[in-house]
Amino acid sequence: STSRGLGDVYKRQMSGKAKNVILFLGDGMSLTTVAASRIYEGQQKGGSGEENLLSWERFPATAFSKTYNTDSQTPDSAGTMTAITTGVKTHMGAIGVSAGSRTDCADSLSKGLLTWLQLADSAGLATGVVSTARLTHATPAATYAHSPERNWENDTDLTEAAKAAGCKDIAQQLLSTSRYGRGPLVALGGGRGEFTTVEERDPEYDDKVGQRLDGRSLVQEWQQAHPQGAYAVSYTHLRAHET
């Protein structure tokens, strides 16, 4: 069959050592979503749709995984992405920490889990995070951050108890991941307001300002620490920084 022939081609191409590892994750991409996509693409090609195969359905191997949190049978993206990046199931809302309580910062400080991105970074490999969501959102954040509560995206989200116990907001953690190596060399996504202060007006939308109340402009801090780096706020700006 065509799919089997393509599978043989993939196997032949997989000989040798891999150059890159890319995890492509469709957040919320359930079986029904995949089925709808398969049918829609097939109909766009002029068929009835059911006979169509999406690109990854031609791979030589596919598998299913059971998704759940330690405290919920219907999971959220924070706990499930933590399971993907660390291999450990955890409570709903948790990012990069083992199971505990969403409100207990002090307890979570001893439950941090290493992600495969951090392991790769510590081995000297180049790493990066690309997302259509905010970089501080649960799914991308689970590659680099450690927090019992997914909603602690900037300093205004943390409770006073969490601040006193020593927890850091997720945006701040993106800048402090260098303890495992260099940290992500590429971070593309939304949510720049989580990194800027309420005194800073958005560079693209004049009616918006940052969200931080601690007076820290994390963007400026990163630029000062990495003068050789590039910060882009749009596609055009990004293309201007291409090397």
Label every model-predicted segment.
Residues 18-30, 120, 188:
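Beta-strand elements within well-structured catalytic alpha/beta cores of enzymes
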Residues 11-17:
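A short acidic-Thr-Gly-centered motif at the start of a beta-strand
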Residues 2, 21-23, 82:
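Short, flexible coil/turn micro-motifs enriched in small/turn-prone residues
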